[in-house]
Amino acid sequence: SYLYWNMILEPWGRSTWGDPQNAMVTVDPGQKRAVFNPDFYVMKHFSNPIRPDAVRLGIKGHMAADSLLFRNPDGSYVVEAFNPFPEEKDLIVELEGERLSFTLAGESFNSMILQK
Protein backbone atom coordinates (compact mmCIF):
# COMPACT_ATOMS: atom_id res chain seq x y z
CA SER A 1 0.00 0.00 0.00
CA TYR A 2 1.02 3.60 -0.44
CA LEU A 3 -0.02 6.83 1.25
CA TYR A 4 0.32 10.08 -0.68
CA TRP A 5 0.65 12.78 1.95
CA ASN A 6 -0.59 15.84 0.01
CA MET A 7 -3.16 14.79 -2.56
CA ILE A 8 -4.65 18.24 -3.13
CA LEU A 9 -3.15 21.65 -2.40
CA GLU A 10 -3.60 25.24 -3.50
CA PRO A 11 -1.01 26.62 -5.97
CA TRP A 12 2.35 26.96 -4.24
CA GLY A 13 0.85 24.88 -1.45
CA ARG A 14 2.58 24.44 1.86
CA SER A 15 2.39 21.74 4.45
CA THR A 16 0.87 22.39 7.86
CA TRP A 17 4.41 23.10 9.12
CA GLY A 18 5.05 25.67 6.36
CA ASP A 19 7.28 23.78 3.89
CA PRO A 20 6.60 24.05 0.13
CA GLN A 21 4.95 20.87 -1.14
CA ASN A 22 3.91 19.22 -4.37
CA ALA A 23 0.55 17.52 -4.80
CA MET A 24 -1.22 15.25 -7.25
CA VAL A 25 -3.88 17.90 -7.82
CA THR A 26 -3.60 21.66 -7.48
CA VAL A 27 -6.86 23.56 -6.90
CA ASP A 28 -6.94 27.30 -7.40
CA PRO A 29 -9.85 28.51 -5.25
CA GLY A 30 -9.90 31.90 -6.96
CA GLN A 31 -10.37 30.40 -10.42
CA LYS A 32 -12.23 27.32 -9.16
CA ARG A 33 -10.01 25.19 -11.35
CA ALA A 34 -8.21 21.90 -10.74
CA VAL A 35 -4.90 21.00 -12.39
CA PHE A 36 -3.78 17.38 -12.50
CA ASN A 37 -0.02 17.40 -11.91
CA PRO A 38 2.56 14.80 -13.08
CA ASP A 39 2.36 12.94 -9.74
CA PHE A 40 -1.34 12.28 -10.43
CA TYR A 41 -0.52 10.49 -13.68
CA VAL A 42 2.27 8.45 -12.09
CA MET A 43 -0.15 7.32 -9.39
CA LYS A 44 -2.69 6.46 -12.10
CA HIS A 45 -0.10 4.27 -13.86
CA PHE A 46 0.38 2.26 -10.69
CA SER A 47 -3.17 2.17 -9.30
CA ASN A 48 -4.97 1.15 -12.49
CA PRO A 49 -3.25 -2.07 -13.68
CA ILE A 50 -1.75 -3.30 -10.39
CA ARG A 51 -4.51 -5.08 -8.50
CA PRO A 52 -4.91 -5.60 -4.74
CA ASP A 53 -2.75 -8.49 -3.50
CA ALA A 54 -0.37 -8.20 -6.47
CA VAL A 55 3.19 -9.31 -5.75
CA ARG A 56 6.26 -7.32 -6.78
CA LEU A 57 8.78 -9.55 -8.50
CA GLY A 58 12.51 -9.14 -8.95
CA ILE A 59 13.82 -7.58 -12.13
CA LYS A 60 17.31 -7.31 -13.58
CA GLY A 61 19.02 -5.81 -16.59
CA HIS A 62 20.05 -2.41 -17.89
CA MET A 63 16.60 -0.85 -17.27
CA ALA A 64 16.07 -2.48 -13.84
CA ALA A 65 16.65 0.76 -11.92
CA ASP A 66 13.74 2.37 -13.78
CA SER A 67 11.37 -0.60 -14.03
CA LEU A 68 9.11 -2.65 -11.77
CA LEU A 69 7.39 -5.97 -12.35
CA PHE A 70 4.24 -7.21 -10.59
CA ARG A 71 2.15 -10.39 -10.79
CA ASN A 72 -1.56 -9.83 -10.25
CA PRO A 73 -3.77 -12.42 -8.53
CA ASP A 74 -5.35 -13.29 -11.92
CA GLY A 75 -1.92 -14.37 -13.23
CA SER A 76 -1.34 -11.31 -15.41
CA TYR A 77 1.91 -9.39 -15.15
CA VAL A 78 2.33 -5.62 -15.02
CA VAL A 79 5.52 -3.89 -16.13
CA GLU A 80 5.99 -0.28 -15.07
CA ALA A 81 8.91 1.28 -16.93
CA PHE A 82 10.34 4.80 -16.95
CA ASN A 83 12.63 5.98 -19.73
CA PRO A 84 14.44 9.06 -18.39
CA PHE A 85 16.50 9.50 -21.57
CA PRO A 86 15.54 11.82 -24.46
CA GLU A 87 15.91 9.01 -27.02
CA GLU A 88 13.86 5.83 -27.41
CA LYS A 89 15.03 2.78 -25.46
CA ASP A 90 14.20 -0.88 -25.96
CA LEU A 91 12.97 -2.84 -22.98
CA ILE A 92 13.15 -6.63 -23.20
CA VAL A 93 11.05 -8.64 -20.77
CA GLU A 94 11.52 -12.38 -20.33
CA LEU A 95 8.63 -14.13 -18.59
CA GLU A 96 7.87 -17.82 -18.39
CA GLY A 97 10.29 -18.59 -21.24
CA GLU A 98 8.85 -15.93 -23.54
CA ARG A 99 10.82 -12.87 -24.66
CA LEU A 100 8.90 -9.65 -25.32
CA SER A 101 10.34 -6.39 -26.62
CA PHE A 102 8.91 -2.92 -26.09
CA THR A 103 10.16 0.41 -27.42
CA LEU A 104 9.84 3.14 -24.79
CA ALA A 105 9.51 6.69 -26.08
CA GLY A 106 12.04 9.17 -24.77
CA GLU A 107 11.22 10.69 -21.37
CA SER A 108 8.15 8.51 -20.92
CA PHE A 109 6.45 6.46 -18.24
CA ASN A 110 4.89 3.22 -19.44
CA SER A 111 2.50 0.58 -18.09
CA MET A 112 2.23 -2.77 -19.84
CA ILE A 113 -0.21 -5.52 -18.86
CA LEU A 114 0.89 -8.96 -19.99
CA GLN A 115 -1.72 -11.73 -20.01
CA LYS A 116 -0.75 -15.38 -19.70
Regions found by a protein language model. Give the residues of each.
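Edge strands and adjacent loops of beta-rich recognition modules
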Residues: 50, 54-56
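Surface-exposed loop/edge segments in extracytoplasmic proteins
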Residues: 98-101
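Aromatic/acidic polysaccharide-binding cleft in carbohydrate-active enzymes
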Residues: 1-41
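Loop/turn elements at helix/coil->beta-strand transitions in domains of secreted/extracellular proteins
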Residues: 1-2, 52, 75
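Short conserved micro-motifs at the rims of enzyme active sites and ligand-binding pockets
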Residues: 13-16, 90-93, 114
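C-terminal beta-strand-rich structural cap/linker in extracellular carbohydrate-active enzymes
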Residues: 103-116
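Acidic carboxylate-rich catalytic motifs and surrounding loops in phosphoryl-/glycosyl-chemistry enzymes
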Residues: 5-7, 57-61
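Carbohydrate-binding surface patches
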Residues: 45-48, 59-96, 107
